[in-house]
Amino acid sequence: MRCWSPCSLLVVIAIYCLSSHTSEAFDLAQACVESQRLSLLPICDTIFAVQQEGAQQSADDGLRSKRFIRFGRALSGDAFLRFGKNVPDLPFEDKRFLRFGRAAPQLDDLLKQALQRVESLQKSDDTSVRRKRSTDAAPQSNTDSAEQKNDSAKITKRYVDDVEDSDVKRFMRFGKRFMRFGRNPSDVGSKLTEKRFMRFGRDPEKRFMRFGKSDDKKFMRFGRNPGDAEDELEEDKRFMRFGRGDEEDEEEAEKRFMRFGRDPEKKFMRFGKNGEEKRFMRFGRNPEEPEADKRFMRFGRGGEEDDVNTEEKRFMRFGRSAEKCKGCLEG
């Protein structure tokens, strides 16, 4: 059997003494906690004081351990980056940090308490806490505020002069139901410039969108004229027309538009200057001429030299022809 060295013997003796003392102290502390008679002894008071000091020291160590960078979920709910020193005397945690996520409920409680204190002080002292200077007028008494409310309740309509009304035509107004752009008609001395606008209302002349400087051919108009039933231009107001309209050549000008209405001649979209009306799309039946076959779209020029068969091949037709229906019935 190998002999023990003096150093090893000293280590074993020290460990035995420490373990025996710690076991005795633990047994004594447990006995002080469990037994009410032993808790009255002075040694038990000393043990309780040591335990409280140890708990306070562990709490201080926990506060000091907050000077770190933590990532992920923490058991204490502190997902933050903190820098600086912690003061253990403060009842709340140090605020020199960057925190991400939800704050601890203790901090919310402290903020609520601070706000309640400020409100209570303000109500008791009748003073307002200002954080910056204000340029508002001094507060008035209750009687002045009541008179001001009564005065504000009375609203009168502003008088508009005719000159001012003519000057404000270059804007978008809601109330007179139009949007107008361009020059003032008083500057030019003509009403032609009034046609560069979009107007909406009950007046039949104002239900259109018009663009251009001169005649009525460059606009889109919708609606009927109920007050003037004998007007020749009543049917001409349900269309969209594009291009220039010359007074000398009204027939060609009428073919550059899309017209909608009950008149069978005006249920079509026509493009071009061809007088033979071959470049258009027409829809609807003609009650006076049932064999006119106007339900088609035609493209190309149709001259007088071409045969009828060649003219009929340059379009797309929808519907039944009267001659073909007769042939089908006879067959």
Swiss-Prot record:
Subcellular location: Secreted
Alphabetically ordered keywords of this record: Amidation, Cleavage on pair of basic residues, Neuropeptide, Repeat, Secreted, Signal
GO biological process: neuropeptide signaling pathway
Entry-annotated residues carrying Phenylalanine amide: 71, 83, 100, 174, 181, 200, 211, 222, 242, 260, 271, 283, 299, 318
Top-level division of the source organism's lineage: Eukaryota
Bilayer-crossing regions: none
Annotated region described as Disordered, given as residue ranges: 122-153
Keyword Secreted recorded: yes
Prosegment location in residue numbers: 26-65, 86-94, 103-168, 184-194, 203-205, 214-216, 225-236, 245-254, 263-265, 274-277, 286-293, 302-312, 321-331
Tissue expression notes: Present ubiquitously in the brain and regions of the central nervous system as well as in the periphery and throughout the dermal chromatophore layer (at protein level).
Leader sequence residues: 1-25
GO cellular component, one term: extracellular region
Protein family membership: Belongs to the FARP (FMRFamide related peptide) family.
Role according to the record: Excitatory neurotransmitters that directly modulate chromatophore function by activating chromatophore expansion at the chromatophore neuromuscular junction.
Protein name: FMRFamide-related neuropeptides
Organism whose genome encodes this protein: Sepia officinalis
Taxonomic classification: Eukaryota, Metazoa, Spiralia, Lophotrochozoa, Mollusca
